[in-house]
Amino acid sequence: MAKYSTLSLILLTLSLLPPSSARPKLLLFLIDGFRFDYISDGELQHLPGFRHMVERGVKVDYMTPAFPSLSYPNYYTLMTGRHCETHHMTGNFMWDPKKNISFDIGANEDSRLPQWWDGAEPLWVTMEKAKRKVSMYYWPGCEVEIRAIKPNYCREYFYYPSEAEFGKSVTDALQSLTRGNAEMAAVYYERIDVEGHHHGPWSEERKNVTRELDQILWHLHQQIREMGLESELNVILFSDHGMTDVFWMDKVIELKNYIDMQDIIQMKDRGPVVSLWPAEGKLSKVYEELRAVQHMNVYQKEDIPERFHYKKGTFVSPLTLVAELGWFIIERKEKLPFWNNGTSINIAWQHGWHGYDNELMDMRGVFLAYGPDFKVNFRSAPIRSTDVYNIMCNVLGIEPLPNNGSWSRVQFMLRSSSGFPTTLHLINLWLSVLPLSLILF
């Protein structure tokens, strides 16, 4: 009799697991460089698409990015819930001195090597392992085989998709969800970041692109309503970091004025965070010379502040330079990153940048969400980029992997903070009841 009772309990436990068809699907948007105050209450008056999301869902006051407040480190933090020193994607530019290979903002072939990506498992890989399909559009990294897995569909990133191409990707993502080709669709949008860099965070060019994005979002909301998907689809929109003004003619730190560049065997990146690998026997000399430089801090690896959650990263350099807000570190001014402004020559400075101390206000990002799992017209306290992973796992019914996010910071934005019963919880419940069943029968 006991074996039949045990079988009954197993069947009861399995019956509590929600069928995949019962779970709302998820549409994700990663908007690069979208600062939190781009959708302040005043700005929302002119952005009906964003306003729709706010009024029908959740808006956090702001989202603090991971350090450094750069793109690739935060792409991976958002999709793994881990600090950069834990997933090891610690910069847009990295170097492996043992193999003498580089990761150069995903543009070079070596950037696709597993060593840069296998430090953690992003959500789309976890879903594919669970036989739950994912479609991704221009999402950096979807083209990479991570832990021997790629998403079911990846429309590979290029620099940079037009508004028409982005609009089509949104339509295609929605269709992939409604036609049963995916349970999660993720779309990346870059132009807010591009115009913020080129013209500055409060430029008319950046504002115009925001209005174009808003129109696409408004059209999406209409499609969801017309297709009757309000109760079947969650929509989440977040950014990787913010943006601040830079004034290069006045606020440039030229390293050549302070150190002998012959003492450096490798330098990665420029701007707010710079990584240096001094030649053998030159570390102390270079460090002491850089300590005297104003408007920046220099850290030996072991002295990097704990709050950055950065120094334990595999590819962190012996010396890390961190500039004050608005200052730009470069070897010499001639190497400043210009853009050609539509001409054949480099004639224009950049006017916006990011990557600074992640606690600075201008580096803060945005998080919006609406759908059947989210409260309506709910303003949430600030969250961190590590927290987003747990939200996505909850609405998808995925057991989250170990991560650095906080559930207590985000649970109140959900209609039900308990979420779906997970397999682990149900197994624990079954094990607690099993001894009683053996006694009774």
Swiss-Prot record:
The active site is at 71 (nucleophile). A lipid is attached at residue 416 (GPI-anchor amidated serine). The keyword Glycoprotein applies. Residues 1-22 form the signal peptide. Disulfide bonds join 142-154. SUPFAM superfamilies: Alkaline phosphatase-like. It is found in: Cell membrane. It catalyses: sn-glycerol 3-phosphocholine + H2O = phosphocholine + glycerol + H(+); a 1-acyl-sn-glycero-3-phosphocholine + H2O = a 1-acyl-sn-glycerol + phosphocholine + H(+); a 1-O-alkyl-sn-glycero-3-phosphocholine + H2O = a 1-O-alkyl-sn-glycerol + phosphocholine + H(+); 1-dodecanoyl-sn-glycero-3-phosphocholine + H2O = 1-dodecanoyl-sn-glycerol + phosphocholine + H(+). Zn(2+) 2 binds at residues 193, 197, 354. Substrate binds at residues 32, 71, 92, 193, 241, 354. Residues 417-441 form a propeptide. It is a lipid-anchor; GPI-anchor. Its main location: membrane. One of its GO terms (cellular component) is plasma membrane. One of its GO terms (molecular function) is phosphoric diester hydrolase activity. Binds 2 Zn(2+) ions per subunit. The keyword Acetylation does not apply. Its cofactor is Zn(2+). GO terms for biological process: choline metabolic process; lipid catabolic process; lipid metabolic process. PANTHER family: ECTONUCLEOTIDE PYROPHOSPHATASE/PHOSPHODIESTERASE, GLYCEROPHOSPHOCHOLINE CHOLINEPHOSPHODIESTERASE ENPP6. Belongs to the nucleotide pyrophosphatase/phosphodiesterase family. This is Glycerophosphocholine cholinephosphodiesterase ENPP6. The lineage of its organism: Eukaryota, Metazoa, Chordata, Craniata, Vertebrata.
